[in-house]
Structure formats: structure tokens, C-alpha cells
């Protein structure tokens, strides 16, 4: 028995050392500046107010038709390392504003995509997908704040959601909105909590996601929205703040530690 515990302890220490070699990431943007570690694509810019303005506006401040912009953290994020899978937590605040409160398009995605991936199709594809059919090579997982269908979607490798929950973006148009997204790798649990801060209305949704099967070892994390094809359906997408942290926890090492104890 003693020798078995010693062997488990030795294996635990080896795995712990390996876990510590994985890259964990943490950053915080209480507001945004042009020299921040961000990759801006399409129509994305940093506004004079320190906001991440993801889709275009006209000279008078109205949302621009058929606009798409993407913003990703410039350093790749490690999601998996051998038996190790990262958990993560991200918080951000956004405002989506449309001219027509009864209908708008298309929404904002928070996405984990392939490193150095170029922008994809506009409109309902949100700049992260190319087709309505499964794309195994897309290696993308996204939480979509779907303003066209008034819901929160979970998308894996194509635009059709495998989980969704109603959330009335039209009713709370223009409100500052706080979001927390968490992923717990110990039970493959992806959760979204959304709070319209003026109306005090909340939405939430969760699902089981085996992230290590859906994305690459290293990913880029960030935002990708698109606006509608007519002036009546366009909207602006501004992110006011964003923080992110990832942490590795080795499932096998936890089992060995329980055996030692």
C-alpha cells in the first residue's frame, strides 16, 4: 500500500510539473487604446471614447449597412496540453444599438477560432463561418448574441446552434449589457450569464462542450459581429471593457491526488 501511494505521489508530481509548463493567460482591458494587444480586422476600430467599435458607423453616427469587424487578443491562448484542458473565465460589457427596435441583424459573437484565421462571410455568418453546413476544419466555438432571432446561441463549427436560449435584445436595445462566460474543463461545462444593466433583466444558458475536441491546441479569442443589409436592420456593436483568464487543471493528476489522500 505504501509503495502504491509513493508511486502515485511520484506520478502526481510529474503531472504537476507538466501542468505548470502549460501556458495560462490573463488580461484586462477596462477600456481600449490603439496600442493594446489586439488584432483588428474589417471595420473594427478603437473610438475616441476608448470603446472597441466593431462595426462601422456613418459620419452622423448611424450604423453602417452590411458591416463586419473582428477584434482578437493578439497572443494565442493555449486550450489543451496533453491530458490538460484549460478552464477559462471572461467578462465583457457591450452595447448593441439599432435604429429599428422591432427588428435588427445580425448580432455579436464571442469566439474561439484558429490562430491567424481570416475573416469569414458576413451577414448571418458573423465573420466566423462560411456555410450553414458543418465545417469540421473550422475548429471554432462561438457564443452568439443573436439579435436577428432574439436569443443566445452556442455554435460549433457552423452557424446553426446546437443550444440556444431566448433573450430579448430588441426590447432592451441600446442598454449597457454585462456578460460572463465560463468554461469548466473538469465537467466540460460552458455557461453564459447576461445582464441588461438598466432594465435589470438577466438571461443565462449552459451546455456540455468538449472543447478539446472542437478547437485547436492554441486559439485566438475575441469578438466578431455583423450588421444588417438594410438601414432598417443595421446596428452598432461596441465593447466597453473585456477581461479574460485561463487556467489548467489536470484531470488525471486530481485522480492520483485523491488516491494519495
UniProtKB/Swiss-Prot annotation:
Belongs to the leguminous lectin family. Disulfide bonds join 167-203. This is Arcelin-5B. The keyword Coiled coil does not apply. Keywords: Disulfide bond, Glycoprotein, Lectin, Plant defense, Seed storage protein, Signal, Storage protein, Toxin. Monomer. Pfam families: Lectin_legB. One of its GO terms (molecular function) is carbohydrate binding. Coiled coil: none annotated. Glycans are attached at residues 91, 100. Residues 1-21 form the signal peptide. InterPro entries: ConA-like_dom_sf (IPR013320), L-lectin (IPR016363), Lectin_LegA_CS (IPR000985), Legume_lectin_dom (IPR001220), Leguminous_Lectin (IPR050258). PROSITE patterns: LECTIN_LEGUME_ALPHA. The lineage of its organism: Eukaryota, Viridiplantae, Streptophyta, Embryophyta, Tracheophyta. GO terms for biological process: defense response. Seed storage. This carbohydrate-binding lectin has toxic effects on bean bruchid pests. The gene is ARC5B.
Amino acid at each position: 500500500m505504501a509503495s502504491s501511494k509513493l508511486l502515485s505521489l511520484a506520478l502526481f508530481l510529474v503531472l504537476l510539473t507538466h501542468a505548470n509548463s502549460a501556458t495560462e493567460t490573463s488580461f484586462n482591458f477596462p477600456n481600449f487604446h490603439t496600442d493594446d494587444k489586439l488584432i483588428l480586422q474589417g471595420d473594427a476600430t478603437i473610438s475616441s471614447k476608448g470603446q472597441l467599435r466593431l462595426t462601422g458607423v456613418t459620419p452622423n453616427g448611424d450604423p453602417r449597412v452590411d458591416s463586419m469587424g473582428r477584434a482578437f487578443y493578439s497572443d494565442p491562448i493555449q486550450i489543451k496540453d496533453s491530458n490538460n484542458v484549460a478552464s477559462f473565465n471572461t467578462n465583457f460589457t457591450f452595447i448593441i444599438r439599432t435604429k429599428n427596435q422591432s427588428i435588427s441583424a445580425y448580432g455579436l459573437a464571442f469566439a474561439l477560432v484558429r490562430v491567424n484565421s481570416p475573416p469569414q462571410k458576413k451577414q448571418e455568418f458573423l465573420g466566423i463561418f462560411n456555410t450553414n453546413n458543418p465545417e469540421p476544419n473550422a475548429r471554432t466555438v462561438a457564443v452568439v448574441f443573436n439579435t436577428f432571432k432574439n436569443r443566445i446561441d452556442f455554435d460549433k463549427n457552423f452557424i446553426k446552434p446546437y443550444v440556444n436560449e431566448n433573450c430579448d435584445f430588441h426590447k432592451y436595445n441600446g442598454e449597457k449589457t454585462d456578460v460572463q462566460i465560463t468554461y469548466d474543463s473538469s465537467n466540460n461545462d460552458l455557461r453564459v450569464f447576461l445582464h441588461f444593466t438598466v432594465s435589470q433583466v438577466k438571461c443565462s444558458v449552459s451546455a456540455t462542450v468538449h472543447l478539446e475536441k472542437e478547437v485547436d491546441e492554441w486559439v485566438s479569442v475575441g469578438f466578431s459581429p455583423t450588421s444588417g443589409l438594410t438601414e432598417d436592420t443595421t446596428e452598432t456593436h461596441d465593447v466597453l471593457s473585456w477581461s479574460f483568464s485561463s487556467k489548467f487543471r489536470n484531470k488525471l493528476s486530481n485522480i492520483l491526488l485523491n488516491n494519495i489522500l
